[in-house]
Amino acid sequence: MVNFDIARKRMVQEQIVGRGITTPRLLEVFQKVPRHLFVQEAMAVQAYSDGPLPIGEKQTISQPYIVALMTDLLELTGNDHVLEIGTGSGYQTAILASLVRRVWTIERIRPLAMQARKVLDTLHLLNVNIKVGDGTLGWPEEGPFDAILVTAGAPAVPETLAAQLAPGGRLVIPVGDESNQTLLRIRKAADGTLTQETGIGCRFVPLIGQQGWQLNS
C-alpha cells in the first residue's frame, strides 16, 4: 500500500526542488495538499508520479513540476486575488487557494467543476469561487486580478484576460498550437503596458472558447 505522505515528500524533493524551485511557501503547500484526492481512485497510486494523468472528459491533471513552475512564476503574495482558467481536477486550484486570499476559477466542463468543488470543500478550502463557463472571457465582474493562471494551451494571449489584470499583475499562460506550446509570463505595468517573458516548452490540452480554440478545430 502506498504511503501518500512519503510519496508526496519525495515528489517535492525530487521533482520540484530537484528542478530548481525553492520558494519556501510554495514547497510547504505542495507538501500539504493531497494530490491523490484529485485523481480517479484507480489512479491514486500514480498521483505523485512525474507526469500528467487523465482525469476524464479528455482532460488531464498536469505534471507536479509544471504546476509548481507555473505557480512560482505568478510571484504570489498572501493578499493576492487570483483568477484560474481551467479548474480541471481542482489540484492547481487547491495550491493557489492555500497561497492567496481568494481564487476565482472557471471550468467549461460541468462534471469536472462539480468534482473539484467536492474535493475542495472536503479540504475546507473555502476561499474559492467556481463557475462553469468560457474561461477565455475571464470573470470581469470580479476583476481586476493580481494574477491570472491559464491551465490550457492558447493560440494567443486572450485580450480579455490581459484586460482583467490589475496594474502590477502577472498572467502565466501556455501559447502555441494545439499540440505544443511555450510558457509565457505577461506583466502589466502601472500605465497598462504589457511586457512578455518566454519560458519553457510545454504541452497542454487546448484552451476552448471564444478567444481560444474552437471545440471542433
Curated annotation (Swiss-Prot):
The active site is at residue 62. It is found in: Cytoplasm. Keywords: Cytoplasm, Methyltransferase, S-adenosyl-L-methionine, Transferase. It comes from the Bacteria. One of its GO terms (cellular component) is cytoplasm. Signal peptide: none annotated. It is an enzyme of class 2 (transferase). Its EC number is 2.1.1.77. NCBIfam families: pimt, PRK00312.1. HAMAP family: PIMT. Belongs to the methyltransferase superfamily. L-isoaspartyl/D-aspartyl protein methyltransferase family. Catalyzes the methyl esterification of L-isoaspartyl residues in peptides and proteins that result from spontaneous decomposition of normal L-aspartyl and L-asparaginyl residues. It plays a role in the repair and/or degradation of damaged proteins. This is Protein-L-isoaspartate O-methyltransferase. The lineage of its organism: Bacteria, Pseudomonadati, Thermodesulfobacteriota, Desulfuromonadia, Geobacterales.
